[in-house]
Amino acid sequence: MKLGFIGTGNMAGAIMGGIIKKGIIAPEEIIGSDIMEAGRERAKKEHGIHVTADNIEVTQKAEVLVLSVKPQFYAQTIAEI
């Protein structure tokens, strides 16, 4: 199963770390997007996942999506995807 995260901040990082540590999903099966380059680089370094700046790429490649953006960005993000 390919898992996609829109947003790779603290909430997403905790979820990713837990599922990878438990062996539920391998890092290679996770893709995450973040508008901030620093966020993408941190997720790639800490979790070994594929990262992108493109939310649409995540929606196209993932079977399951996790929306992990701040509440004030929900409407904008949902409209985009």
Name each region found by the language model.
Residues M1-E46, H50-A53, E57:
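NAD(P)+-binding Rossmann beta1-loop-alpha1 motif at the extreme N-terminus of oxidoreductases
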Residues H50-I81:
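Rossmann-fold NAD(P) dinucleotide-binding segment
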